[in-house]
Amino acid sequence: MSKALKGDVPVSSSFEEKMKALEAARLQIEKQFGQGSLMKLGKDDAVQGVEVIPTGNILLDEALGIGGYPRGRIIEIFGPESSGKTTLALHAVAEAQKRGGIAAFIDAEHALDPQYAKDLGVSVGDLWISQPDTGEQALEIAESLVRSGAVDIIVVDSVAALTPQAEIQGDMGDAHVGLIARLMSQALRKLTSIINKSKCTLIFINQLRMKIGIMFGNPETTTGGIALKFYSSVRIEVRKVETLSRGDEEAWGNKVRIRIVKNKMAPPFRKVETEILFGKGFSAFSCLLDAAVKQEIIEKKGAWYAYREEKIGQGRDNAVGFLQQNMDITLEIERAVRTKLFPKQAFISSFQEHRPALSLEASPEESDAKTLRRXASRGAGASSSRVQEGSAANDHFQDESTTAKLL
């Protein structure tokens, strides 16, 4: 068939000729830029299933819509002081390490507590840590780690502490307008493509600042300009709701509200209210109980909780205590919840650090019904005092001064 000319570009008059022209263009592109530079979506492994790193909180996994933090993407966690931002990031590090991943922590604030990280389940002896002097150094280290292709998760704590070299070399009181914003914008442009190829999850922790002269609307904003807002696939806001205590007792935790402000992987603006226990992080058993009730795997009638028609406790604290004391049943419930929420994901328990030798391959039918009844009776008569979470700390860790690997 004949072709009409539009300038110097031939316009094909049939579908077959268009496809031939497109194939010739594809071959030329691949010759110039390499194999896989142009492909059809859904073919030639152009798009694979989204790989994730669980958050350590099954309720937050559900709110994110895909079961955790997506690999190969940039995540921003922000909020007021002492709201739980670093706790969220350390839980993600622990979950990545459980799955055999390599984690790095860029401590720009020079404030990471190894003991607290250990208590949250982080293998401190396997964690790579850097405490850079300048923001440029921190971001160059992050880029080098991403380019290596060997690191699964990197945490930068925090954006506000990425002090530009010009500011460090200057005097106190000197005005340095927009230096962090320019630094972040340049770094993120370089990092975006290599992060996706390396399947590394890069988490930026950020602080809040107040805008000057704002009369209407929310005066709060995050540091580092707006580049991070654009490049982040997921933005998570963490805020403290209340301090957890009973009467005159000493406070033992915080209740926090986690809101998904931006989500390119699933619908955004979902909210989760959860507990963070001092020195222990997420109340994992409480989160599992709430998720199981929501998915109707555990039945709640009045104050009683029941699993497979067997009562496991009267009141929330007693039901949580039952889960802590019966890890076989806890893993059954966790498997059922995760299978229902994320059927395509392989099951790896978030509780394996509590009982490392436990086999995760046992079917739900293999649990001992007598154990269920016996432990349920204990749970029903247990005291209603607050149930403490089981510690995940390993007693055989080395001294803190020698465990962290310095870059």
Curated annotation (Swiss-Prot):
The keyword Cell membrane does not apply. Pfam families: RecA (PF00154), RecA_C (PF21096). Residues 377-386 have a biased composition (Low complexity). Residues 358-407 are annotated as: Disordered. InterPro entries: AAA+_ATPase, DNA_recomb/repair_RecA, DNA_recomb/repair_RecA_CS, P-loop_NTPase, RecA-like_C, RecA-like_N, RecA_ATP-bd, RecA_C_sf. It is found in: Cytoplasm. PROSITE patterns: RECA_1 (PS00321), RECA_2 (PS50162), RECA_3 (PS50163). GO terms for molecular function: ATP binding; ATP hydrolysis activity; ATP-dependent DNA damage sensor activity; damaged DNA binding; single-stranded DNA binding. Keywords: ATP-binding, Cytoplasm, DNA damage, DNA recombination, DNA repair, DNA-binding, Nucleotide-binding, SOS response. GO terms for biological process: DNA recombination; DNA repair; SOS response. Gene3D superfamilies: P-loop containing nucleotide triphosphate hydrolases. The keyword Nucleotidyltransferase does not apply. Belongs to the RecA family. This is Protein RecA.
